[in-house]
Every structure is written in structure tokens, then in C-alpha cells.
Regions:
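Short cytoplasmic-facing helical segments at TM-TM junctions of multi-pass membrane proteins
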Residues: 162-207, 228
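Periplasmic/extracellular loop-to-transmembrane helix junction in inner-membrane transport proteins
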Residues: 17-19, 47-94
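C-terminal transmembrane helix and the adjacent membrane-cytosol boundary/short C-terminal tail
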Residues: 111, 168, 203, 246-277
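Alpha-helical membrane-protein architecture signal
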Residues: 62, 75, 79, 83, ...
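Transmembrane alpha-helical segments of polytopic membrane transport and secretion proteins
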Residues: 1-35, 260-277
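Generic hydrophobic transmembrane alpha-helix motif, especially the helices
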Residues: 122-158, 165-166
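Transmembrane alpha-helices
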Residues: 149, 153, 185-219, 242, ...
């Protein structure tokens, strides 16, 4: 069997125009919401309704941000803190995708693999990362391995479960058609199962990435000397609220940018997903 291709999806011009208009409308609503939140933040701090110790004004956060970029905080600049966190998130996400997708395919496609692996994933998935953080430190020490491993475990479960769900929902007619043409098991996985499960896999990656960012602060509690989570925790101990707010905003912006990138990738790779037929 040489190749299997997914049929092209025909999109009507009228529906494309409507989709673009709806997208622009949604973006304007999102932008106005963001502007409104910043205005409320500024108004609350300008009228001294909340003391700067608890909520610094936007101008103070921006000034502190420039100071962190130029001189740094806790012996590292903002870029160094950001680079350390991104490397940990990137390694955790990369290893999770490389291992969770094959595991999810095995769970969704093989009864024995499902019986062995599914209970293990469901057993540890609800446990908060902070609960098994001490055990990881005992096993792996306080180096980078323990930080990346904690993030990896947090991201692994959502991707594996989403992949298994996508595999189980593959149209049996597609599998039978490919088998009738002489497809091997490897060809079925590559040309039928993976393309059909791709929307669920990408959704799992998006969910896992969000969980990974929320685990980052816990991971950087392990004897870290740099990283956004470390920066926020250190600033909180000394009540440096503007650094805390800045760190939270940077994490939110980076996570949001990654989420938008994954959404764009999902629209590019699986344009038919979510369309009304």
C-alpha cells in the first residue's frame, strides 16, 4: 500500500466570509475586554482603593519590568528567567509528546495495553504535582532533571488520554477500507489512525501545556536559581508585589501566545475539525 490521503474539504466562499467576520468580531470583543481590565486596574490603583503593597499600578509594573530587563532580579535578568522557564517547559512538553502519543495509541487500539497502562495513568493523574514533588526530589535530586520530570508528568496524562480518545473514535469504515487495500498495522496507524486522532491529540497538547505552566511554579521550588516561577516565589517572600505581578503577567502572556500558536497549528493541520456539515 503506497499512500492514503484524506479527502479534501470543500469550503464555500460565503461560509469563509462569515467565518472571517465572526473571527474579527470575537477579536474585537477580546481586545475591548483586555482594555477594560487594564482601565479598571489603573482606576483602582489611581484612586488608592487598594494599597500599592497589595496591587501596584500598571506604571510601576512597567517600570519594574524595564529594570528587570536591564539590571535583573536575583542575579538574573528577565530574559534569563524567561529562558530558564521556557527550556523546562519545552523539554517537558517535547518528551511528553514523544511518549504520550504512542502510549495513547496503544491504549486506544490494544485491549491489553489499555488494561495495563490506563489504570496507571488514571491513578496518578488526579494527584497534584506538589504531592509527589518530595518523592521526585528523593529519586532525582534537586537538579534540572527533577524540575523537567515534574512538568513532564503533568503534561503526559492529558496528551495520552486525549490521544486514546481520538483513536477510539476513528471511523471503523476507514479502517476496514484501508485493510481491504492491504494496509499493514503500521500503515493503518500512520495513514488512518493518526490523521483521524490528530484533532484530539492537539487538544490534549493544548490542555497539557496549560497544566505544564501551572506546574512550573511548583517545579521551580526545587532549589532553582532562575525561572519565572522562582522569580515570583522569591519576590513574594519579600513582598515585592510589582515583581510578583510582572512575573504572573509574563507567564500569562507567554502561555497565551503558545495557546494561540497551537490553535493556529490546529486550524492549519485539521481545517475540517469543528466545521458544521
Amino acid at each position: 500500500m503506497s499512500s492514503y490521503e484524506i479527502p479534501a474539504v470543500t469550503v464555500k466562499p460565503g461560509s469563509t466570509v462569515i467565518a472571517v467576520r465572526r473571527s474579527l468580531s470575537t477579536r474585537w470583543i477580546s481586545l475591548l475586554t483586555l482594555v477594560a481590565l487594564v482601565v479598571i486596574w489603573w482606576a483602582v490603583t489611581a484612586t488608592a482603593m487598594i494599597e500599592p503593597l497589595f496591587l501596584p499600578p500598571p506604571s510601576a509594573v512597567l517600570q519594574k519590568g524595564w529594570l528587570l530587563v536591564t539590571t535583573g532580579y536575583m542575579d538574573s535578568t528577565l530574559w534569563q528567567h524567561l529562558g530558564a522557564s521556557l527550556s523546562r517547559i519545552g523539554l517537558g512538553l517535547g518528551f511528553a509528546v514523544l511518549t504520550a502519543v504512542p502510549v495513547g495509541i496503544a491504549i486506544g487500539d490494544n485491549r491489553i495495553a489499555r488494561g495495563i497502562l490506563d489504570p496507571l495513568i488514571e491513578f496518578y493523574r488526579p494527584i497534584p504535582p506538589l504531592a509527589y514533588l518530595p518523592l521526585i526530589v528523593i529519586w532525582c535530586g534537586i537538579g534540572e532533571l527533577s524540575k523537567v520530570l515534574l512538568i513532564y508528568l503533568a503534561i503526559f496524562a492529558p496528551i495520552a488520554i486525549a490521544t486514546a480518545t481520538g483513536v477510539r473514535t476513528v471511523d471503523p469504515a476507514k479502517l476496514r477500507a484501508a485493510q481491504s487495500l492491504g494496509a499493514t498495522k503500521a500503515q493503518l496507524i500512520r495513514h488512518v489512525i493518526l490523521p483521524s486522532a490528530l484533532p484530539d491529540i492537539l487538544t490534549g497538547v493544548r490542555i497539557g501545556l496549560g497544566v505544564g505552566w501551572s506546574t512550573l511554579v511548583a517545579a521551580e521550588l526545587i532549589a532553582a536559581t532562575s525561572g519565572l516561577g522562582f522569580m515570583v516565589q522569591s519576590a513574594a517572600q519579600f513582598l515585592v508585589t510589582d515583581v510578583v505581578v510582572l512575573g504572573i503577567l509574563v507567564i500569562a502572556l507567554i502561555a497565551f501566545a503558545m495557546e494561540m500558536g497551537l490553535r493556529a497549528l490546529q486550524r492549519k493541520l485539521v481545517p475540517w475539525h469543528g466545521q458544521a456539515h
